[in-house]
């Protein structure tokens, strides 16, 4: 059993989603958004750090998965996003959580089956995969999708490692 915290970083709204994985079974534990209503960036970063730390304390995840930075058209926005990611990652590292990063395209490909999927498609598939009664908020859905992606990627890595181990054992005999 593993608990995964997914984070969709943003300097104004940071989505989070927490799921439990037992084998191939995924269970929704919680999700939401950290909203920073203050104007100055340092105060927003402090709120993101405090919010992520609180979520980690509440859910006690085993893994921390976050979206990678994409190249934005606006350099200022990309820098602010990078800083928001940074404080979220520091919150995880301070709690000694292993950090995994996934590209937005990989997340959409994993959850929807199309790397260029729309936000509404991600919301719908997250709702379906986690058997939720309604679509989660967009940022929370993205965070849940990141957590789901981590589950699928880690499951595939474990299967590949097991196959290689079995192959190596076969060669050693």
From Swiss-Prot:
Mg(2+) 1 binds at residues 8, 139. It is an enzyme of class 3 (hydrolase). Mg(2+) 2 binds at residue 67. It catalyses: Endonucleolytic cleavage at a junction such as a reciprocal single-stranded crossover between two homologous DNA duplexes (Holliday junction). The keyword Nuclease applies. GO terms for biological process: DNA recombination; DNA repair. It is found in: Cytoplasm. One of its GO terms (cellular component) is Holliday junction resolvase complex. Binds 2 Mg(2+) ion per subunit. InterPro entries: RNaseH-like_sf (IPR012337), RNaseH_sf (IPR036397), X-over_junc_endoDNase_Mg_BS (IPR020563), X-over_junc_endoDNase_RuvC (IPR002176). Its cofactor is Mg(2+). Disulfide bonds: none annotated. Pfam families: RuvC (PF02075). It comes from the Bacteria. The active site is at 8, 67, 139. GO terms for molecular function: crossover junction DNA endonuclease activity; DNA binding; magnesium ion binding. Keywords: Cytoplasm, DNA damage, DNA recombination, DNA repair, DNA-binding, Endonuclease, Hydrolase, Magnesium, Metal-binding, Nuclease. Its EC number is 3.1.21.10. Its main location: cytoplasm. Homodimer which binds Holliday junction (HJ) DNA. The HJ becomes 2-fold symmetrical on binding to RuvC with unstacked arms; it has a different conformation from HJ DNA in complex with RuvA. In the full resolvosome a probable DNA-RuvA(4)-RuvB(12)-RuvC(2) complex forms which resolves the HJ. Belongs to the RuvC family. The RuvA-RuvB-RuvC complex processes Holliday junction (HJ) DNA during genetic recombination and DNA repair. Endonuclease that resolves HJ intermediates. Cleaves cruciform DNA by making single-stranded nicks across the HJ at symmetrical positions within the homologous arms, yielding a 5'-phosphate and a 3'-hydroxyl group; requires a central core of homology in the junction. The consensus cleavage sequence is 5'-(A/T)TT(C/G)-3'. Cleavage occurs on the 3'-side of the TT dinucleotide at the point of strand exchange. This is Crossover junction endodeoxyribonuclease RuvC. It comes from Salmonella paratyphi C (strain RKS4594).
